[in-house]
């Protein structure tokens, strides 16, 4: 399997600062390590501060699998991520 870079964009129901506290928490760090996701970047739009981008790297197909799991969806929504607004694109270098 090759390494895949996954770009997620989505809207927040809370502020970016509130969401970042959750995303940068030790619990979410442990989750990323357990499932094999490496976060590379997270940021907010200059135009719309409730629009977020997150870039992960993982084995090909892993991020889409993780982010389609109902338990994962429930957990990320509890942190302010509006899942229905999520757009996922995947990128490879080979």
Task: Spell out what each predicted region is.
Residues 1-73, 82-94:
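Short S/T/G/P-rich N-terminal loop/turn motif that feeds into the first structured element of a domain
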Residues 77-79:
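Short, exposed beta-strand-loop hairpins at the edges of beta-sheets
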